[in-house]
């Protein structure tokens, strides 16, 4: 005998957890493995930053699409009576907000500062905008950290919903 849940929407919940796990894994991989590796291996920090920025932009778009899809699925599960997914929607909404701020506010602003500096023949870190760029980078890093922690919490909560503690 197994203690595996056999609820009506068990497969949908498993798919939800699977997609969420892959997504959060990609966030962690990009932010805490790929980006640091780029800066550690490429000698030109400007190039490393541009490549990392492009990768983070793709990750932000993936986050936006997956987050919206998961919110739709969570709404469907709530409408089918799985009320525990109400709280999951709030986590997803916060993650969506993090991705949107990064993708539509911070990254374009930083790209603009970088392009402006390059048009003047210098890397952004040697331009008059270096301080602002560093501040924006710090804010973007903080938001990405919040999104990553929310993602870890999301997967933790989802795994508890599918595999509740047995007494």
Q: Which residue stretches match the model-derived regions?
A:
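Interfacial loop at the N-terminal end of multi-pass membrane proteins
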Residues: 2-68, 72-86, 112-130, 166
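Alpha-helical transmembrane segments and their helix-start/interface "positive-inside/aromatic belt" motifs
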Residues: 7-20, 86-96, 151-160
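Hydrophobic alpha-helical membrane-insertion segments
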Residues: 21-25, 91-107
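Hydrophobic/aromatic residues in alpha-helical transmembrane segments
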Residues: 34, 106, 151-154
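Transmembrane alpha-helical segments in integral membrane proteins
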Residues: 69-80, 143-165
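Hydrophobic residues within alpha-helical transmembrane segments
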Residues: 18, 61, 65-68, 94, ...
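Individual transmembrane alpha-helices with interfacial aromatic-anchor signatures
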Residues: 55-56, 127-148
């Amino acid at each position: 005998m197994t203690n595996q849940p056999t609820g009506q929407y068990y497969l949908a919940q498993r798919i939800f957890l699977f997609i969420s796990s892959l997504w959060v894994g990609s966030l962690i991989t990009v932010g805490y493995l790929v980006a640091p590796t780029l800066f550690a291996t490429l000698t030109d920090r400007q190039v490393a930053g541009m490549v990392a920025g492009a990768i983070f932009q793709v990750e932000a778009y993936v986050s936006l699409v997956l987050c919206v899809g998961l919110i739709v699925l969570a709404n469907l599960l709530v409408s089918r009576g799985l009320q525990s997914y109400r709280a999951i929607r709030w986590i997803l909404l916060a993650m969506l907000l993090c991705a949107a701020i990064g993708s539509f506010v911070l990254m374009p602003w930083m790209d603009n500062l970088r392009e402006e500096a390059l048009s003047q023949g210098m890397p952004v870190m040697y331009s008059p905008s270096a301080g602002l760029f560093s501040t924006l980078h710090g804010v973007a890093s903080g938001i990405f950290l919040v999104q990553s922690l929310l993602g870890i919490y999301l997967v933790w909560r989802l795994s508890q919903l599918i595999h509740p503690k047995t007494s």
